[in-house]
A protein has these predicted regions:
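Catalytic subdomain that performs nucleotidyl-dependent activation
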Residues: 92, 101, 126-209, 214-220
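Short Cys/His-rich micro-motifs in 6-15 aa windows
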Residues: 256-264
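Histidine kinase transmitter module recognition
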Residues: 28-31, 206-210, 244
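Short, flexible, mixed-charge glycine/proline-rich loop motifs
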Residues: 226-237, 243-248
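C-terminal-of-GTPase-core extension/linker across diverse P-loop GTPases
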Residues: 219-227
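Residue-level detector of flexible, active-site-proximal loop/helix-junction positions
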Residues: 46, 75-77, 151, 191, ...
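Short cysteine-rich clusters marking metal-coordination/redox-active sites
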Residues: 240-244, 253-256
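ATP-dependent adenylation/nucleotidyltransferase module used to activate substrates
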Residues: 1-146, 166-180, 253
């Protein structure tokens, strides 16, 4: 997952998961003098929400004596998320969908700018299984394999991503953060009420309560599915976006496609 000379961009949001991840990687990195941990965050531009989360992220970085690197939607795409939501013409495409596409692009951009070898994200077990089930329910099971590409098989133009907390439950992450009194922002995003993920989360929480071990068992099934997909002769062909030159499976990458739809 990591090498002893890695330059690691740690994606933090100010929330509990990424705060715990940064703290753990910082402790580990102290034993590897040739490696470097660089906290990075994306400012989506959500009025009344992101500024408070950024305060928590800055507080943690000061505590760990690390410099936080920030990249905003506004500077990269010309719009904040609030402005994107106001300009969207298709209400069926939720704010979280826009945010997901643009956050992934922004994280890749800032990691490339910092010449990072890898991006570490704070996805925990609950997050991962919610995503797995959402992809299955949407009829896009192939995305499970595409979003969990082994580091040594990353597509050129994409900084490899790792999920060190993928087997740790949200409950345990919270316990770690509270035990060490780590600063984090725990107010939900104002756009979260639009998220399809909420229904999936509620279902999985109920299943884990009734059938303990459901989440970890589903992770193992997901890993088996990923292995099967990757043994298939079918390959995902990437070209370059005609507009921004980013890796893309089609003429226009999803980020540019969405920017065109809102009038950019």
């Amino acid at each position: 997952m990591l090498y002893d000379k890695d330059r690691i961009a740690v994606a933090i949001s100010g929330g509990k998961d990424s705060s715990v991840l940064l703290h753990i990687l910082h402790q580990i990195e102290n034993g590897y003098p040739d490696s470097e941990v660089i906290p990075v965050t994306i400012d989506e531009g959500i009025q009344g929400y992101r500024n408070k989360a950024l305060e928590s992220a800055h507080e943690l970085c000061r505590f760990l004596d690390l410099k936080l690197e920030v990249l905003s939607f506004k500077s990269l795409f010309g719009y904040s998320l609030d402005e994107i939501v106001q300009r969207r013409t298709d209400d069926s495409f939720g704010a979280c969908s826009y945010c997901g596409v643009f956050r992934r692009r922004a994280l890749n951009t800032i990691a490339q700018n910092l010449e990072a070898d890898v991006i570490a994200t704070g996805h925990n077990l609950d997050d991962e299984i919610q995503t797995v089930l959402m992809n299955i329910l949407r009829g896009d099971s192939g995305r499970i394999a595409r979003t969990n590409v082994p580091r040594d098989e990353a597509v050129e133009g994409f900084v490899p991503r790792i999920k060190p907390l993928i087997e740790i439950t949200e409950r345990d992450v919270v316990a770690y953060a509270h035990f060490l009194e780590l600063p984090y922002h725990d107010v939900p995003c104002p756009y979260a009420e639009e998220a399809y993920r909420n229904d999936v989360r509620a279902f999985l929480n109920d299943m884990e309560y009734r059938r303990p071990g459901t989440l970890l068992a589903t992770l193992r099934s997901s890993e088996a599915m990923t292995k099967a997909f990757r043994q298939s002769p079918t390959k995902w062909e990437f070209t370059r976006c005609e507009k921004c030159n980013a890796p893309s499976p089609s003429k226009l990458c999803k980020a540019c496609e969405l920017l065109e739809s809102i009038g950019s």
